Protein backbone atom coordinates (compact mmCIF):
# COMPACT_ATOMS: atom_id res chain seq x y z
CA UNK A 1 0.00 0.00 0.00
CA UNK A 2 2.83 2.41 0.85
CA UNK A 3 4.50 1.83 -2.52
CA UNK A 4 1.21 2.29 -4.39
CA UNK A 5 0.45 5.52 -2.53
CA UNK A 6 3.93 6.81 -3.29
CA UNK A 7 3.48 6.14 -7.01
CA UNK A 8 0.07 7.84 -7.08
CA UNK A 9 1.49 10.95 -5.39
CA UNK A 10 4.39 11.03 -7.85
CA UNK A 11 1.96 10.80 -10.78
CA UNK A 12 -0.17 13.62 -9.39
CA UNK A 13 2.66 15.98 -8.42
CA UNK A 14 5.31 15.15 -10.97
CA UNK A 15 7.73 12.31 -11.60
CA UNK A 16 10.65 14.19 -10.02
CA UNK A 17 8.88 14.72 -6.69
CA UNK A 18 10.73 11.98 -4.85
CA UNK A 19 14.04 13.16 -6.33
CA UNK A 20 13.80 16.41 -4.36
CA UNK A 21 14.94 17.31 -0.86
CA UNK A 22 15.03 20.69 0.83
CA UNK A 23 18.31 21.25 -1.04
CA UNK A 24 16.86 20.42 -4.45
CA UNK A 25 17.48 17.44 -6.75
CA UNK A 26 19.31 14.46 -5.28
CA UNK A 27 21.52 11.81 -6.85
CA UNK A 28 21.08 8.11 -6.17
CA UNK A 29 24.35 8.21 -4.20
CA UNK A 30 22.73 10.46 -1.57
CA UNK A 31 22.39 8.71 1.80
CA UNK A 32 18.77 9.88 1.89
CA UNK A 33 18.00 7.43 -0.93
CA UNK A 34 16.94 3.90 0.04
CA UNK A 35 19.65 1.53 -1.18
CA UNK A 36 17.45 -1.50 -0.64
CA UNK A 37 14.94 -0.02 -3.08
CA UNK A 38 17.73 0.77 -5.56
CA UNK A 39 19.06 -2.81 -5.48
CA UNK A 40 15.80 -4.69 -5.24
CA UNK A 41 12.87 -4.36 -2.86
CA UNK A 42 12.61 -2.42 0.39
CA UNK A 43 11.32 -4.45 3.38
CA UNK A 44 9.02 -1.53 4.23
CA UNK A 45 7.08 -2.25 1.03
CA UNK A 46 6.70 -5.98 1.71
CA UNK A 47 4.66 -6.12 4.91
CA UNK A 48 2.10 -3.37 4.39
CA UNK A 49 -1.32 -4.14 5.91
CA UNK A 50 0.05 -7.05 7.98
CA UNK A 51 0.74 -7.20 11.71
CA UNK A 52 4.43 -6.75 10.84
CA UNK A 53 3.76 -3.51 8.92
CA UNK A 54 6.97 -1.46 9.17
CA UNK A 55 5.32 1.78 8.11
CA UNK A 56 6.65 4.01 5.32
CA UNK A 57 10.37 3.91 4.63
CA UNK A 58 12.07 7.08 5.94
CA UNK A 59 14.32 7.19 2.87
CA UNK A 60 13.59 8.21 -0.71
CA UNK A 61 12.06 5.69 -3.12
CA UNK A 62 12.25 6.83 -6.73
CA UNK A 63 11.85 4.73 -9.86
CA UNK A 64 13.94 7.25 -11.77
CA UNK A 65 16.82 7.05 -9.30
CA UNK A 66 16.53 3.27 -9.38
CA UNK A 67 16.88 3.32 -13.18
CA UNK A 68 19.82 5.73 -12.91
CA UNK A 69 21.53 3.41 -10.44
CA UNK A 70 20.92 0.30 -12.55
CA UNK A 71 22.49 1.98 -15.60
CA UNK A 72 25.45 3.31 -13.62
CA UNK A 73 26.10 0.01 -11.83
CA UNK A 74 26.96 -1.69 -15.13
CA UNK A 75 30.24 0.21 -15.24
CA UNK A 76 30.89 0.82 -11.53
CA UNK A 77 30.46 -1.24 -8.36
CA UNK A 78 29.01 1.06 -5.70
CA UNK A 79 28.88 -1.66 -3.05
CA UNK A 80 25.20 -0.95 -2.37
CA UNK A 81 24.30 -4.61 -2.65
CA UNK A 82 26.21 -5.25 0.59
CA UNK A 83 24.07 -2.57 2.26
CA UNK A 84 21.01 -4.25 0.78
CA UNK A 85 22.12 -7.62 2.13
CA UNK A 86 22.73 -6.13 5.58
CA UNK A 87 19.21 -4.66 5.60
CA UNK A 88 17.63 -7.95 4.51
CA UNK A 89 19.57 -10.03 7.03
CA UNK A 90 18.71 -7.61 9.82
CA UNK A 91 15.00 -8.23 9.22
CA UNK A 92 15.60 -11.99 8.90
CA UNK A 93 17.55 -11.96 12.18
CA UNK A 94 14.72 -10.06 13.89
CA UNK A 95 12.27 -12.68 12.64
CA UNK A 96 14.53 -15.50 13.88
CA UNK A 97 14.63 -13.88 17.33
CA UNK A 98 10.83 -13.77 17.37
CA UNK A 99 10.78 -17.46 16.42
CA UNK A 100 13.11 -18.27 19.33
CA UNK A 101 10.95 -16.23 21.73
CA UNK A 102 7.75 -17.87 20.47
CA UNK A 103 9.29 -21.32 20.89
CA UNK A 104 10.45 -20.41 24.40
CA UNK A 105 6.96 -19.20 25.31
CA UNK A 106 5.43 -22.39 23.95
CA UNK A 107 7.87 -24.54 25.90
CA UNK A 108 7.38 -22.47 29.02
CA UNK A 109 3.62 -23.03 28.81
CA UNK A 110 4.22 -26.76 28.51
CA UNK A 111 6.43 -26.65 31.61
CA UNK A 112 3.76 -24.74 33.46
CA UNK A 113 1.20 -27.39 32.54
CA UNK A 114 3.52 -30.08 33.86
CA UNK A 115 3.94 -28.10 37.07
CA UNK A 116 0.16 -27.84 37.44
CA UNK A 117 -0.16 -31.61 37.01
CA UNK A 118 2.47 -32.08 39.71
CA UNK A 119 0.64 -29.68 42.04
CA UNK A 120 -2.67 -31.45 41.49
CA UNK A 121 -1.08 -34.79 42.33
CA UNK A 122 0.31 -33.26 45.54
CA UNK A 123 -3.10 -31.83 46.41
CA UNK A 124 -4.78 -35.22 45.92
CA UNK A 125 -2.11 -36.89 48.06
CA UNK A 126 -2.50 -34.20 50.75
CA UNK A 127 -6.28 -34.58 50.73
CA UNK A 128 -5.84 -38.30 51.31
CA UNK A 129 -3.45 -37.62 54.22
CA UNK A 130 -5.94 -35.16 55.73
CA UNK A 131 -8.73 -37.75 55.55
CA UNK A 132 -6.52 -40.34 57.26
CA UNK A 133 -5.58 -37.94 60.07
CA UNK A 134 -9.22 -36.94 60.66
CA UNK A 135 -10.20 -40.62 60.89
CA UNK A 136 -7.36 -41.27 63.34
CA UNK A 137 -8.28 -38.20 65.40
CA UNK A 138 -11.85 -39.44 65.77
CA UNK A 139 -10.56 -42.82 66.94
CA UNK A 140 -8.16 -41.20 69.43
CA UNK A 141 -10.93 -38.97 70.78
CA UNK A 142 -13.13 -42.00 71.44
CA UNK A 143 -10.27 -43.64 73.33
CA UNK A 144 -9.65 -40.43 75.38
CA UNK A 145 -6.04 -40.17 74.10
CA UNK A 146 -5.97 -36.39 74.23
CA UNK A 147 -2.21 -35.84 73.79
CA UNK A 148 -2.10 -38.00 70.65
CA UNK A 149 -5.22 -36.28 69.34
CA UNK A 150 -3.58 -32.85 69.83
CA UNK A 151 -0.49 -33.96 67.88
CA UNK A 152 -2.73 -35.13 65.05
CA UNK A 153 -4.59 -31.81 65.17
CA UNK A 154 -1.30 -29.89 64.78
CA UNK A 155 -0.35 -32.10 61.82
CA UNK A 156 -3.82 -31.57 60.35
CA UNK A 157 -3.39 -27.79 60.43
CA UNK A 158 0.05 -28.10 58.80
CA UNK A 159 -1.38 -30.20 55.98
CA UNK A 160 -4.27 -27.79 55.47
CA UNK A 161 -1.82 -24.87 55.25
CA UNK A 162 0.33 -26.82 52.79
CA UNK A 163 -2.72 -27.71 50.71
CA UNK A 164 -3.76 -24.04 50.54
CA UNK A 165 -0.27 -23.09 49.30
CA UNK A 166 -0.50 -25.74 46.58
CA UNK A 167 -3.98 -24.63 45.59
CA UNK A 168 -2.99 -20.93 45.50
CA UNK A 169 -0.10 -21.76 43.17
CA UNK A 170 -2.45 -23.66 40.86
CA UNK A 171 -4.84 -20.69 40.81
CA UNK A 172 -2.03 -18.23 40.02
CA UNK A 173 -0.79 -20.40 37.15
CA UNK A 174 -4.31 -20.79 35.80
CA UNK A 175 -5.02 -17.10 35.34
CA UNK A 176 -5.11 -17.86 31.60
CA UNK A 177 -8.31 -19.78 30.81
CA UNK A 178 -7.79 -23.51 30.66
CA UNK A 179 -9.02 -23.64 27.03
CA UNK A 180 -6.36 -21.15 25.96
CA UNK A 181 -3.72 -23.08 27.88
CA UNK A 182 -4.76 -26.37 26.31
CA UNK A 183 -4.77 -24.80 22.86
CA UNK A 184 -1.29 -23.39 23.49
CA UNK A 185 0.09 -26.90 23.85
CA UNK A 186 -1.26 -27.70 20.39
CA UNK A 187 0.56 -24.78 18.75
CA UNK A 188 3.74 -24.84 16.73
CA UNK A 189 5.80 -21.92 15.47
CA UNK A 190 6.26 -21.27 11.75
CA UNK A 191 10.02 -21.33 11.07
CA UNK A 192 9.62 -18.85 8.22
CA UNK A 193 7.54 -15.97 9.62
CA UNK A 194 7.29 -16.72 13.40
CA UNK A 195 3.47 -17.03 13.39
CA UNK A 196 1.76 -19.61 15.57
CA UNK A 197 0.16 -22.55 13.76
CA UNK A 198 -2.30 -24.97 15.30
CA UNK A 199 -1.77 -28.68 14.84
CA UNK A 200 -5.56 -28.87 14.60
CA UNK A 201 -5.78 -26.56 11.58
CA UNK A 202 -7.27 -28.14 8.47
CA UNK A 203 -5.54 -28.07 5.09
CA UNK A 204 -7.46 -24.96 3.99
CA UNK A 205 -6.35 -22.90 6.99
CA UNK A 206 -2.75 -24.04 6.61
CA UNK A 207 -2.88 -23.17 2.90
CA UNK A 208 -4.21 -19.71 3.80
CA UNK A 209 -1.27 -19.21 6.15
CA UNK A 210 1.39 -20.36 3.68
CA UNK A 211 -0.11 -18.17 0.94
CA UNK A 212 -0.52 -15.19 3.28
CA UNK A 213 1.28 -11.91 2.70
CA UNK A 214 3.43 -12.05 5.84
CA UNK A 215 4.58 -15.64 5.31
CA UNK A 216 5.35 -15.08 1.62
CA UNK A 217 7.11 -11.82 2.50
CA UNK A 218 9.50 -13.46 4.93
CA UNK A 219 10.02 -16.40 2.58
CA UNK A 220 10.99 -13.91 -0.13
CA UNK A 221 13.32 -11.99 2.23
CA UNK A 222 15.07 -15.20 3.24
CA UNK A 223 15.46 -16.40 -0.35
CA UNK A 224 16.76 -13.05 -1.60
CA UNK A 225 19.19 -12.73 1.32
CA UNK A 226 20.49 -16.29 0.85
CA UNK A 227 20.94 -15.95 -2.92
CA UNK A 228 22.42 -12.45 -2.68
CA UNK A 229 24.98 -13.50 -0.06
CA UNK A 230 26.07 -16.44 -2.21
CA UNK A 231 26.29 -14.17 -5.26
CA UNK A 232 28.32 -11.49 -3.48
CA UNK A 233 30.68 -13.99 -1.85
CA UNK A 234 31.28 -15.69 -5.21
CA UNK A 235 31.95 -12.28 -6.73
CA UNK A 236 34.45 -11.49 -3.96
CA UNK A 237 36.23 -14.81 -4.47
CA UNK A 238 36.40 -14.22 -8.22
CA UNK A 239 37.71 -10.71 -7.65
CA UNK A 240 40.34 -11.94 -5.18
CA UNK A 241 41.38 -14.62 -7.66
CA UNK A 242 41.76 -12.05 -10.45
CA UNK A 243 43.70 -9.72 -8.13
CA UNK A 244 46.00 -12.60 -7.19
CA UNK A 245 46.57 -13.50 -10.82
CA UNK A 246 47.25 -9.84 -11.64
CA UNK A 247 49.77 -9.58 -8.81
CA UNK A 248 51.51 -12.75 -9.97
CA UNK A 249 51.61 -11.42 -13.55
CA UNK A 250 53.03 -8.10 -12.34
CA UNK A 251 55.62 -9.90 -10.22
CA UNK A 252 56.59 -12.12 -13.15
CA UNK A 253 56.89 -9.06 -15.40
CA UNK A 254 59.01 -7.30 -12.79
CA UNK A 255 61.28 -10.35 -12.45
CA UNK A 256 61.65 -10.52 -16.23
CA UNK A 257 62.70 -6.86 -16.31
CA UNK A 258 65.23 -7.46 -13.54
CA UNK A 259 66.64 -10.49 -15.34
CA UNK A 260 66.86 -8.56 -18.61
CA UNK A 261 68.67 -5.67 -16.95
CA UNK A 262 71.26 -8.02 -15.42
CA UNK A 263 71.82 -9.73 -18.79
CA UNK A 264 72.27 -6.36 -20.47
UniProtKB/Swiss-Prot annotation:
Component of the U1 snRNP particle, which recognizes and binds the 5'-splice site of pre-mRNA. Together with other non-snRNP factors, U1 snRNP forms the spliceosomal commitment complex, that targets pre-mRNA to the splicing pathway. GO terms for biological process: mRNA 5'-splice site recognition; mRNA cis splicing, via spliceosome; mRNA splice site recognition. The keyword Coiled coil applies. It comes from Schizosaccharomyces pombe (strain 972 / ATCC 24843) (Fission yeast). Component of the U1 snRNP particle, a subcomplex of the spliceosome. It is found in: Cytoplasm; Nucleus. Keywords: Coiled coil, Cytoplasm, mRNA processing, mRNA splicing, Nucleus, Ribonucleoprotein, Spliceosome. Residues 83-126 form a coiled coil. Pfam families: LUC7. One of its GO terms (molecular function) is mRNA binding. GO terms for cellular component: cytosol; nucleus; U1 snRNP; U2-type prespliceosome. Residues 233-264 are annotated as: Disordered. This is U1 snRNP-associated protein usp106. The lineage of its organism: Eukaryota, Fungi, Dikarya, Ascomycota, Taphrinomycotina. The keyword Methyltransferase does not apply. Belongs to the Luc7 family. Residues 233-258 have a biased composition (Basic and acidic residues).
Amino acid sequence: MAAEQRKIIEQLMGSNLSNFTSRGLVHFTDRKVCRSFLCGICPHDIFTNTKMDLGPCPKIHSDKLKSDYERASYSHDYGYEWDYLEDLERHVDDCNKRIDIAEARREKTKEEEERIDELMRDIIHTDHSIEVIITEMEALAKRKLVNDAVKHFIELNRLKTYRKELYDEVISMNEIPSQASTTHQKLQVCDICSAYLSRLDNDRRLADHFSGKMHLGYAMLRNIARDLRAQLEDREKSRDKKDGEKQRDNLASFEDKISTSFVA
